[in-house]
Swiss-Prot record:
The gene is Slc25a41. It holds the Pfam family Mito_carr. GO terms for molecular function: ADP transmembrane transporter activity; ATP transmembrane transporter activity. This is Calcium-independent mitochondrial carrier protein SCaMC-3L. One of its GO terms (biological process) is ATP transport. It comes from Mus musculus. The chain crosses the membrane at residues 33-50, 88-107, 131-144, 182-200, 219-243, 279-298. The lineage of its organism: Eukaryota, Metazoa, Chordata, Craniata, Vertebrata. GO terms for cellular component: mitochondrial inner membrane; mitochondrion. SUPFAM superfamilies: Mitochondrial carrier. It catalyses: Mg(2+)(out) + phosphate(in) + ATP(out) = Mg(2+)(in) + phosphate(out) + ATP(in); ADP(out) + phosphate(in) + H(+)(out) = ADP(in) + phosphate(out) + H(+)(in). InterPro entries: Mit_carrier, Mitochondrial_sb/sol_carrier, Mt_carrier_dom_sf. Gene3D superfamilies: Mitochondrial carrier domain (1.50.40.10). The keyword Membrane applies. Its main location: mitochondrion.
């Protein structure tokens, strides 16, 4: 299985690694990370308008101008112009490098631990390794997630930039505000990882039955497998993702100190169960283009850097 799946970026921060580097590739780790960071930067920038629309639909679900994707995008352009569709993208790109580096490192340590017990890695061990990698990375970059949400939601002139946004949050709410939404974020990892990896494994089995060589899969096979498994993972964990975003943005909306239980109750009382899936349309729409852009840029970067991926 090619290592390119490790860093295929669909713009979803909970995305778990599906494979790890072989021993022969250890010396070129920085090339994989650089390729992945560049691929993620291009794909996230390309789909940033959909991501900003998603956040607005999640947070301002009661406003009529954000009831659907097109009206939401129109409202954003009217408020701040076309360039405003990329608000929050800078820090979203900035956090890619540490995010990937942490996931790689934790996954490698987990692989070494499990391989010390027996020679092959079981499905449940892959879930544990993937979940742990995401949990550690999200714990360390959660402050950047909060800043990204606030910058994405800002209106024209609210913040002078990233540092000004961080300063205002710290002055008003203290350091604890930088970990708003942490609990639902952690809880969302388990359903995401289990669903993502289960669907991915199922697709690998189906491709093998169809006669595909999974030791050296084609780009279409790799992209379709990761895209579908990621989409299923997002749907499984989406209510928790929505609650996390609402908690991170709560001061922007109501000026209160939100709790996970309180946000859940408010959504259910005001919008019912469908309210837990507000913003799902732009989320699903950006998975395929984000994955496709990421894959193409990643392969191009590997060629540029002279990386040879060894099959198992």
């Amino acid at each position: 299985m090619g290592v390119h799946l490790e860093v295929l970026d669909t713009g979803e921060q909970l995305m778990v690694p599906v494979d790890v580097l072989e021993e022969e590739n250890k010396g070129t780790l920085w090339k994989f990370l650089l390729s992945g960071a560049m691929a993620g930067a291009v794909s996230r920038t390309g789909t940033a308008p959909l991501d900003r629309a998603r956040v607005y639909m999640q947070v301002y679900s009661s406003k009529s101008n954000f009831r659907n994707l097109l009206s939401g995008l129109r409202s954003l352009v009217q408020e701040g112009g076309v360039r405003s569709l990329w608000r929050g993208n800078g820090i979203n790109v900035l956090k890619i490098a540490p995010e990937y580096a942490i996931k790689f490192s934790v996954c490698e340590q987990s692989k070494n631990f499990f391989y010390g017990v027996h020679s092959s890695q079981l499905f449940q061990e892959r879930v544990v390794a993937g979940s742990l990698a995401v949990a550690v990375s999200q714990t360390l970059i959660n402050p950047m997630e909060v800043l990204k949400t606030r910058l994405t939601l800002r209106f024209t002139g609210q913040y002078k930039g990233l540092l000004d946004c961080a300063r205002q949050i710290l002055e008003r709410d203290g350091t604890r505000a930088l970990y708003r939404g942490y609990l639902p974020n952690m809880l969302g990892i388990i359903p995401y990882a289990c669903t993502d990896l289960a669907v991915y494994e199922l697709l690998q089995c189906l491709w093998q039955k169809l006669g595909r060589d999974m030791k050296d899969p084609s780009g279409l096979v790799s992209l379709s497998s990761v895209t579908l498994s990621t989409t299923c993972g997002q749907m499984a964990s989406y209510p928790l993702t929505l609650v996390r975003t609402r908690m991170q943005a709560q001061d922007t909306v109501e000026g209160s100190n939100p709790t996970m239980q309180g946000v859940f109750k408010r959504i259910l009382s005001q919008q019912g169960w469908p309210g837990l899936y507000r913003g799902m349309t732009p989320t699903l729409l950006k998975v395929l283009p984000a994955g496709g852009i990421s894959y193409l840029v990643y392969e191009a970067m590997k060629k540029t850097l002279g990386v040879q991926v060894l099959s198992r």
